[in-house]
Structures are given as C-alpha cells and as structure tokens.
C-alpha cells in the first residue's frame, strides 16, 4: 500500500544513489530549490493529506513540548492545533501512520508540515552543515522537527480532545534534527520572520513548519516506536551542532517526566541517525517533474485520508508498500547496523564514516526501524566547501563496502549489529548516553575512524613497470603483493660494510630502471614511524705503499687477538728534528684534555669569570668601525669637546675617529710646562692616562692592564678597525724609547715570519707617537700564567696542562732560535692565555728582546728566571730563554718558583743548592766571579734576610719537585745546565720524551737522602748516572770528612781513593743518587 501516491515511480536503485546524495547537500537558499513552485502546492489537491493554515507561526496559547521540560506536570501536543484554511499556500500538513508488527508496534502518526510561503524547505543535514560553517551561527538557524509516537491520529485527536491545547501530562512533543537513528528530516525555515522571543517559543509556543509526531505515554506503555528508540519523545530547543553532542538545550534532564515502568532515567530520546546518502555527492540533480508530480498525485489520491495505516513487517516490505514518491520523500527504513551486502540489495546506502563510524550495516527484522521524509532539492548553487568532503566520504564508503563485500564478513557484522542493537536497547531505557543514541564506546571509535579515514590522502596507483619488471626488488609478483619483511637495523648496518660489488649483485643493474613511484605527502606521524635511512659509506681506500714495508703487521678483523709487533718498526720510523712534524697525532688529543683541565681549574672562580665576560661583551658591543672625519669637521662627532691644546694638536691628524667621552674631564692637574710634557707626564715619565679619553684621536681608553719598568699597558677600543687592542705606552725616556724601537722592529719581523699565527706569539697591530710617547698596539689577550697559578691556590697545574703549554713555548722558542732572536724576559707574567677555558697561550713583551750579537744590556731577565751566565756576567744568547723555560715549567708544577732568591747572591746559592757550584772553566769566564766566589773559587757564604744558609748539593731535583716522572725530571734538568753549550736547544726539547710521550723504563731513586734504600744493583748492569754540572777545581783541596760520616761529595770521594783505598770496598749498602749523594755508607763487618 502507498501512503503518498505519485504519477511516476522513482526507484531507489544504485543509479539514483549519487543523485540522492547531491540533492541533500545543495544550497537551500535558492528560490526554486526543490523544483516546487507556489502554484504546484494547490490546497485543493493536497487537502486529503492534511490541513492547512495561514499562520506561519502557531498559536502562542498552545502549549509546547518545552513546557514539559520545565515542569513535569505540563505537556502539550502539537497535533491538536487547529489551522484556519483561508491561506493554503503557507503550510502543508500530512499524516502518515505506519503500523508496528506484533505486540511491539502500535499505530503511529506522522504529521509533516511544509511551507513555501515565506521560507524554504531544508533538511537537518543542511542545518548541521550551515550551523558549522555559517558565521552567524545563531539560535535562529534551527531545524524544527517534532517527532513522537501517538496511537491517536490527528483528526481524531482534534475531535476527541477539544482541550488538547491545554497542558496535558500524556502528550509530549520533541523537536530533533540531525539525529542518529533517523534519516535526513525536512524542516521549515522561515527567512522572512524570526521568533521574537525564543524563550517564549520554547516554553509556550511551537514553531511553524515542523514534523510533529506525538505519543500518548499513558495509553502505550512499554512499546518501542519505529521512529524513536524510547517511549517518550521530547522537544529539543535546537538541533545539535555535531552528531552526538547536544548544545543550547535550555532545559534540564531532571525535569522530564519519568516512566517508572520503563526505567527511563533522563527521558530524552536517543539522537536519530543521519541517512547514509548524505554528504557523498553534489553533482547530481533530481528532475523537478518527479517531485512535483509525486506531490500532486499523492495529494489527489489521499485526499480523504486522515490516517494511513499499514503493518510494517520488514524494512524491504515497508519500501515496497510505500508509493514511489514516498520512496523519495521518506528516507529508507533501515537499521543503524545493517550489512553492506544486504543493504545494496534492499536499495539502502552505507552510512558515511563521519556519521556511522564506518560500521557495516545489516538488515535485521527484529531491530528498530526509522522513517523520515526526504525531498531531494535541486543543486543549483552547490556549496564548494562541502564538495571535496563529500567526495572523500563517498570514496571511503565505497572502499569500505568493496572491502567488506570482498572478504565476506557477514556473520561477524551481524553479531556486531546484534551487540549494537542490545546497546541501543539499554540506552533507550535511560541514562545520559540514551540522549545521544549510541553506546558508551562508539564516540571513541567514531573519533578514531574519522581521523583515520577522513584525513588520509588518496593512494596513487603503482606504475605497471614496478609490477611487471621481475628484475627489481619489488614485492609484487604476478600482479599480487607478497608479504615482505622489513630488514632490521642490524641487517642494514651489516649491509653498509659489504663491498659495492656484493651490494650491486643483489639487483640486475643492466635492466632498465622502472619509472619512479609517485610519492605521497608525508605526515609527521609517518615520519616518526619511518626508520632512518643510512647514508652510503664510501669504501676504505687501499693502504699506501709506504705502509707495506718490512715489519708491517696486517690488520686483524678480530679484536680478541693482537699479534706482537716487530721491533723493526721503531727502527724504520726515525724521529725528525722538525717540531711541526713530531707528535702530530697525540697533540690534538692532549690539547683537548688540557682544555678540560683548564675548565676544571677556572670553575673555582666562575663568578669572577662571568663578571669579566659581561664586561668584555659590553666592550665588544661598543667596538665598531667609525667613519673618520676631517680635522676641520670635528664638530660633527658627538664626543667630548676639545681643549685648547687639542684644538691646536688636532691639526696634525688627518682622520679623526674619537675625541673622548662627553662626561670625561681631560684636564691635567700639573702645570703645563715643557718639563712635564705640558702636564701629560708624571715625574717618572709615564703618560697620565684618563679613562674615557682618546689616544691619537683613534683609540678610546677603557682601563689599565698592567704597568712595568718600560711603561704601562692599556685596554683600548680601536675605532678604525672596530677591535679591542692592548696599547703599550712607553715611558718618555730615551733608554726605554730606544728599546721600544727594537721591540717594534722585532714585532714587525715576527708578523712577517708568522703570517698564519702558528708560533704562539702576540700579533703586532700598529705603532705611533702620541705626545712624545711611543705607543705599540697589539692584540688583546687574557690573563697571564702567574694569575692562573694564583687562582689555583699556588697548588700547581695538572701535568697535561703543563705539557700543552710547554709544547707551545718550545714552538715559540724554536722560531726565535732559528731567527737568532733572544726574548730576554720569559716569565709567567709574559705568557698570556688566549681564552680562560683553554690552554692556548701566547708570548708577549718583546721589549727586552734583541738579536744575537746585538746585546745592549747586561742586566736582563727577571731574577727568579735569570740564567747563570747573566748573573755571572758571561756572554748570553738564546740558551738563556731555555733556562727560563725550565724554571717556568718547574713553577707550573709546584706553584712556587724553583729558585726564589732575594738577590743575585741568594739566587746563585739556590741554584748551587740543587746542582752544586759551577765548573772552574765557567768561573774563569765570568766577569763578576769575585762577587760570588773567593780567590780559590769557593762560593762565598751567604745568609738570607730570613737567616737561611744554603749549602751546595743539599737537595735533589726530585726532592724539590716531589715528582716521580722520569721524563719530566729529565726535561727540567736538561734545561737547567750550568754550561749553555750543554743546555738543551728548543729543537731538541721538541723531541724529548716528556713531549713525545715515550716513557723511560728506568725508574729514578725517589727516596730522600736520609732514608733506607735497598741493595745496590750489579755494577755491570747499573745504568749510567745522569751527568751533573761540572764542579769547580778548587773543591779538590778541601779535606774530606771521616769515612764513618756521610759524605756530601761523591766526586771528592772518588778522587780520594788513593788516600783511602779501602773506602769503597768496605761500603756494602751504598748508592749514588742523581746529584751525587751517598745515602748510607756502612763499613763491612769483618768475620
């Protein structure tokens, strides 16, 4: 049987599926959107279907369903509203009432309101889409649907209940759109008029143009409806913004009337389901004639019908009984979880993944079914934003349908549908999730499915060449993909080291390479899951021919066995005398370890270093290059004004960069006369420096760095180069002036000899005269070595730092020795660090330097580091710097000077205390021998101011240093030889064991002088004692001590063997130390 008869039947086959999808998503604001004109809606032809009214808005005195929301005792029914029949073009009212099956179904009435006078037909899906995307997004954009279950038809209800306009506790009305259990429902949207009072509309009135389905709760208890999952249908104040979420309801669920027998907790029905044919396509249009003809015929055939009843057996039979037009205007009756295969046969469509979570849909006779009216609009103005989304949804649905149909998961899907129906049954009995009409876990599945299917890009087709070509490493065989196993990281790592031929043999390189596979757009999640692709490691180059000489041992693959190397290898590798070629591999490693040790040392004074770093950073920010101006345009510089002397002085300078800070007082307190250099010098001849003042109208004085006998050193900003420099201002004395000229000459030579700055010497910048003072500008460095030792608490430096600094100092001395330059003032104060956290150093202060053969001064070097030939008045050369180097290394190790003499007499006594007096040959060459020795060559006794008397050979070097490193002790002793000709040169020092890392197998005797020692070794195998400084000849005349007493002079003991022939033979436990001490002479006991 048909509810609405039509002149032409339109089937719901697959050919009209896309058309139904597009017609529901078309623009609803077109004037002829649905192809229905005003003249087609003839009241005479549609009078049998329903009643008409000229009022767009219903009577405000009629009670609404929202009244029941606010008060449990007040209800209303929209079925009993009487409409005047003067205006028939404004409303279309149809009553359709399908019958239920068995005892679980009852008579239901469908009341549909349509209007074309002031508004347009619209669907709940359109409302949902427009509400999401419209900028207005107000409460006026509502989909007004009233759905309910009422066993009493409209006219009978109007006749039997004359007071139906009053409140009733048995009639309820609900307005639900975009629900889950229903298909797309039609609603009336009035464009010309809006509710003046929305709260009043919700509480006391009913909106015009709604589908009203009512239910009498008292008469139909414990029965499920075809159109709702519960026994009650309530009015929702507005449509949900998104499926499953209720917003702006303006009522509380606790105020709804409860049915105790049903167990409905909240009273709000579940949200109906959006039909599957929504949001898939927007390109198809439905003919206008089908809709108009269907409406005309259906209205004529059902003219005198007030209620149409039919038993509803199955979902397929329901569609067969409906008229063709009802198949178009009413949505397909389907279950929320019907199978895809059976759904295709029954002309129903799969729900998109956005709404239905991509669950297979199966037809079930026992499940609840829903019916909603649908009218497919004309898509004259398609929404461009909705089109891509709809197409992608259709693609996902089709792919899901094909996948399910291919694998045939019918039994599994039916079991899922039964579980889902049971969950819906539970949700229909009440609870919070009963309002949303899905199970508690469906929202999570829905979100996961939406993120999985909606945002996934389209997978491009694989080129045929990859499938057909069998030479490639493709996992496709005969057009079918075979399961492959991804190689592990270890396998990939092993393949890196395979030869290139073996890797290339895996694939046929002769065959033509297939075309590249088009790549997909990679997302962030895909990148995180992709394994790292290792780069190709080049093959190991072959060994050079010189490595394949005699004695070379081939490399072994196993690390568990290391063959013993041949001794011929050391013989073939002869050490070179060049310092640059020695120890090239160990030096970078030692430098890094030394830098770590420097960080540990300076970490104790990190606060001061941070303050210094802030000051340095502020200076670096101020340092910049300034464009100079002429001396006549000095007023253009925003600096300090010129004094009267400067106004006359500035004429001697062509380029003016800086004249001083504006808040600096540049006036000198002394009288401006010629004796004091117009007040710019003090009585010592040093320049009176004012911080913030200029030097030569180019440098800005920042602070003081140091002051010495030659003058003073300032830290300045050079505005010509934009760098920080150290400016040395020499005293205004002729002696120092001449020496400063020599220094400037040597610095210029060093810049020529070392253009790449590789020999650890300060870099010269410029020199000039300013107010009768010679100024020398060099690069700015850090603190000196003495301050480093002081910051470490005079505890000495680590041996790795000492080795690193020693190597750099020897590198400097090597260049000076090759160029025959004597530094003449090598000390810790003249060795500066380049960085506080690094061991890189540079040698400064060449003010006392000279060339060999051009020695001017005899009193040179600092006392603690002064060589013996300088003290004794002998001729000196480059070996004096090697002596100073030995003293500096010893001080870096102990933290104190090795020879701390108060004057030259005590300084020489400190040297003889460890190494003894010098040889007579050296004393004869001394011009000052009478100061330190008597006529017989004996050292004159000397007592210091502290009452300390030092005796020769009273201490050993290892006692003073408290060191057991043989190479280190040997290195210092070779630097501290009496004879300069026997002293170690810088080239020899570069090849010493201490710097090259070769350790001597001979262990020194580190026991003190008065300590027990073991039995002496055999004389034949005893090592040769290290040579000592030559002793003066006058010591032969001294009387020897008694044999029973310890002797302090081993050489005298050996020379007096004629007088005491049995002395050495009677000693059983005796050994000669490094400095010639007899440890414990003991007479041999007689039997």
From Swiss-Prot:
SUPFAM superfamilies: Protein kinase-like (PK-like). The modification Phosphoserine is found at residue 513. One of its GO terms (biological process) is establishment or maintenance of actin cytoskeleton polarity. It is a peripheral membrane protein. One of its GO terms (cellular component) is plasma membrane. The active site is at residue 825. GO terms for molecular function: ATP binding; phosphatidylinositol phosphate binding; protein serine kinase activity; protein serine/threonine kinase activity; protein serine/threonine/tyrosine kinase activity; protein tyrosine kinase activity. Residues 57-81, 120-182, 238-308, 336-578, 992-1011, 1017-1056 are annotated as: Disordered. Autophosphorylates at the cell cortex to lower lipid affinity and promote membrane release. Dephosphorylation by dis2, regulated by tea4, triggers membrane association. Residues 478-488 have a biased composition (Basic residues). Residues 62-81, 292-307, 362-373, 429-442 have a biased composition (Low complexity). It catalyses: L-seryl-[protein] + ATP = O-phospho-L-seryl-[protein] + ADP + H(+); L-threonyl-[protein] + ATP = O-phospho-L-threonyl-[protein] + ADP + H(+); L-tyrosyl-[protein] + ATP = O-phospho-L-tyrosyl-[protein] + ADP + H(+). Residues 397-407, 527-536 have a biased composition (Basic and acidic residues). Residues 132-165, 246-256, 336-361, 555-578, 1045-1055 have a biased composition (Polar residues). Polarity factor involved in localization of polarized growth and cytokinesis. Forms an intracellular gradient that serves to measure cell length and control mitotic entry. Controls the timing of mitotic commitment by regulating the inhibitory impact of cdr1/cdr2 on wee1 activity. Directly phosphorylates the tail of cdr2 which inhibits cdr2 activation by ssp1. Cdr2 phosphorylation by pom1 also modulates cdr2 association with membranes and inhibits cdr2 interaction with mid1, reducing its clustering ability, possibly via the down-regulation of cdr2 kinase activity. Belongs to the protein kinase superfamily. CMGC Ser/Thr protein kinase family. MNB/DYRK subfamily. This is DYRK-family kinase pom1. It comes from Schizosaccharomyces pombe (strain 972 / ATCC 24843) (Fission yeast).
């Amino acid at each position: 049987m048909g509810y609405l008869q039509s002149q032409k039947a339109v089937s719901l086959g697959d050919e009209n599926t896309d058309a139904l999808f597009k017609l529901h998503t078309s623009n609803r604001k077109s004037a002829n959107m649905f192809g229905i004109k005003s003249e087609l809606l003839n009241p005479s032809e549609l009078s049998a279907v329903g009643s008409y009214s000229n009022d767009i808005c219903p009577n405000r005195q009629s009670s609404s369903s929202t009244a029941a929301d606010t008060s449990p005792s007040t209800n209303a029914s929209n079925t009993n509203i009487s409409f005047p029949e003067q205006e028939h073009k404004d409303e279309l009212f149809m009553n359709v009432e399908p019958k239920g099956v068995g005892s679980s179904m009852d008579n239901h009435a469908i009341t549909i309101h349509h209007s074309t006078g002031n508004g347009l037909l619209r669907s709940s899906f359109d409302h949902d889409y427009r509400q999401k995307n419209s900028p207005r997004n107000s409460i006026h954009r509502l989909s007004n649907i009233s759905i309910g279950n009422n066993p009493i038809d409209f006219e009978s209800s109007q006749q039997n209940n004359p007071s139906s306009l009053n409140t009733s506790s048995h009639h309820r009305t609900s307005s639900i759109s975009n629900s889950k259990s229903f298909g797309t429902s039609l609603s009336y949207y009035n464009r010309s008029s809006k509710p003046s009072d929305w709260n009043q509309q919700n509480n006391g009135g009913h909106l015009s143009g709604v589908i009203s389905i009512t239910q009498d709760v008292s008469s139909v208890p414990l029965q499920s409806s075809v159109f709702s999952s519960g026994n009650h249908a309530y009015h929702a104040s507005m449509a949900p913004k998104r499926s499953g979420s209720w917003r702006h309801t303006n009522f509380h669920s606790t105020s709804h009337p409860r049915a105790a027998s049903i167990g409905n907790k909240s009273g709000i029905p579940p949200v109906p389901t959006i039909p599957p044919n929504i949001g898939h396509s927007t390109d198809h249009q439905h003919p206008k004639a089908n809709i108009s003809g269907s409406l005309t015929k259906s209205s004529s055939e059902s003219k005198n019908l007030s209620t149409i009843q039919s038993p509803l057996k199955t979902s397929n039979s329901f569609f067969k009984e409906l008229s063709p037009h009802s198949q178009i205007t009413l949505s397909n009756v389907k279950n929320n979880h019907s199978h895809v295969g059976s759904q295709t046969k029954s002309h129903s469509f799969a729900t998109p993944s956005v709404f239905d979570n991509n669950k297979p849909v199966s037809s079930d006779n026992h499940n609840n079914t829903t019916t909603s009216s649908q009218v497919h609009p004309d898509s004259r103005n398609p929404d461009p934003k909705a089109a891509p989304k709809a197409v992608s949804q259709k693609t996902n649905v089709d792919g899901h349908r094909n996948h399910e149909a291919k694998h045939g998961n019918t039994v599994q899907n039916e079991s899922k549908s039964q579980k889902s129906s049971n969950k819906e049954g539970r949700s229909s009995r009440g609870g919070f999730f009963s309002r949303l009409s899905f199970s508690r876990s469906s929202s999570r599945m829905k979100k996961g499915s939406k993120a999985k299917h909606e945002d996934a890009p389209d997978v491009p087709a694989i080129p045929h060449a990859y499938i057909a070509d069998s030479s490639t490493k493709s996992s496709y065989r005969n057009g079918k993909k075979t399961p492959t196993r991804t190689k592990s990281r270890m396998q990939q790592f092993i393949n890196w080291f395979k030869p290139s031929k073996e890797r290339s043999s895996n694939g046929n390189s002769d065959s033509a390479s297939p075309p590249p596979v088009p790549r997909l757009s990679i997302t962030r999640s895909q990148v995180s899951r992709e394994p790292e692709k290792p780069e190709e490691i080049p093959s190991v180059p072959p060994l050079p021919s010189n490595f394949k000489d005699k004695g070379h041992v081939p490399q072994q693959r196993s690390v568990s066995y290391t063959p013993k190397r041949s001794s011929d290898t050391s013989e073939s590798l002869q050490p070179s005398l060049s310092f640059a070629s020695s120890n090239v591999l160990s030096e970078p490693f030692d430098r890094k370890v030394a830098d770590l040790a420097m960080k540990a040392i300076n970490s104790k004074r990190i606060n001061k270093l941070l303050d210094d770093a802030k000051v340095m950073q502020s200076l670096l920010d101020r340092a910049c290059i300034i464009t100079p101006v002429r001396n006549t345009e000095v007023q253009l510089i925003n600096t300090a004004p010129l004094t009267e002397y400067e106004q006359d002085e500035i004429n001697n300078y062509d380029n003016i960069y800086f004249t001083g800070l504006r808040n600096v007082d540049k006036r000198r307190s002394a009288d401006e006369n010629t004796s004091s250099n117009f007040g710019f010098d003090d009585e010592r001849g040093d320049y009176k420096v004012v911080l913030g003042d200029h030097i030569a109208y180019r440098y800005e004085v920042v602070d003081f760095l140091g002051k010495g006998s030659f003058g003073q050193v300032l830290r300045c900003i050079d505005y010509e180069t934009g760098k920080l420099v150290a400016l040395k201002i020499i005293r205004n004395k002729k002696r120092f002036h001449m020496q400063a000229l020599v220094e400037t000459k040597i610095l210029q030579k060093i810049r020529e000899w070392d253009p790449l700055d590789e020999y650890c010497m300060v870099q010269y910048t410029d020199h000039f005269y300013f107010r009768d003072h010679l100024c020398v500008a060099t690069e700015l460095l850090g603190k000196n070595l003495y301050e480093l030792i002081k910051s470490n608490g005079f505890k000495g430096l680590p041996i790795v730092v000492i080795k690193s600094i020693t190597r750099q100092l020897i590198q400097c001395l090597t260049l000076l020795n090759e160029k025959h330059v004597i530094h003449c003032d090598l000390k810790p104060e003249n060795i500066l660090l380049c960085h506080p956290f690094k061991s890189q150093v540079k040698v400064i202060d060449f003010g006392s330097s000279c060339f060999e053969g051009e020695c001017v001064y005899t009193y040179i070097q600092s006392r603690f580091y002064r060589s013996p030939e300088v003290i004794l008045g002998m001729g000196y050369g480059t070996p004096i710097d090697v002596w100073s180097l030995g003293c500096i290394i010893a001080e870096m190790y102990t933290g104190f000077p090795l020879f701390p003499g108060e004057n030259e007499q005590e300084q020489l006594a400190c040297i003889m205390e460890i190494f003894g007096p010098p040889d007579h040959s050296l004393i004869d060459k001394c011009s000052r021998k009478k100061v330190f020795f008597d006529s017989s060559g004996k050292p004159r006794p000397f007592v210091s101011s502290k009452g300390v008397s030092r005796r020769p050979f009273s201490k050993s070097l290892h006692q003073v240093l408290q060191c057991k490193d043989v190479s280190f002790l040997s290195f210092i002793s070779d630097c501290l030889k009496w004879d300069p000709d026997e002293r170690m040169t810088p080239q020899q020092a570069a090849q010493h064991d201490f710097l090259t890392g070769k350790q001597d197998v001979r262990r020194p005797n580190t026991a003190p002088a008065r300590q027990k020692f073991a039995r002496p070794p055999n004389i034949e195998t005893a090592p040769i004692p290290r040579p000592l400084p030559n002793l003066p000849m006058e010591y032969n005349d001294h009387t020897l001590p008694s044999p029973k007493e310890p002797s302090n002079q081993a050489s005298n003991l050996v020379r007096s063997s004629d007088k005491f022939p049995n002395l050495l033979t009677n000693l059983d436990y005796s050994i000669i130390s490094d400095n010639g001490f007899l440890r414990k002479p003991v007479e041999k006991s007689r039997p």
